[in-house]
Amino acid sequence: MEWLRISTSTELVRVATDEIVYVRADGNYSDMVLTNGKSRKMTFQLHFFDEVFQQLQNNMFVRVGRSLIVNKRYIYVINLTEQQLILSGGDLKEPIVFYGQSNANSPQNITLSREGLKMLKELLENEKGNDNG
């Protein structure tokens, strides 16, 4: 299990990467959402997490558009027609649904582009792994 350590001048946050479901942009901050449903506001922009996740050995995080980085472990459905991304599985109690630009009902206030979802789908289809899919 890999751990993510984020240090600021006033605190150190240490979290297992398996417990991170997604990180979303919120202006100059980012919200890290964990499997237990809790969200932690971090004083870093999303590009900081993008760089940190790229340095991890497990390669489990992927950026989906300008506002969102998701843990690939929790990707359940990518639906290009509905422009929908559903995260589920693991320790998540309920699925998390992100909608495309044509649907403003996303509870996470993030809209995903069709192109971003298409790239994510292709990335996962071309990955070599043990998931038979």
Show where each model-derived region lies:
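Basic, polyanion-interacting recognition surfaces, primarily
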Residues: M1-G133
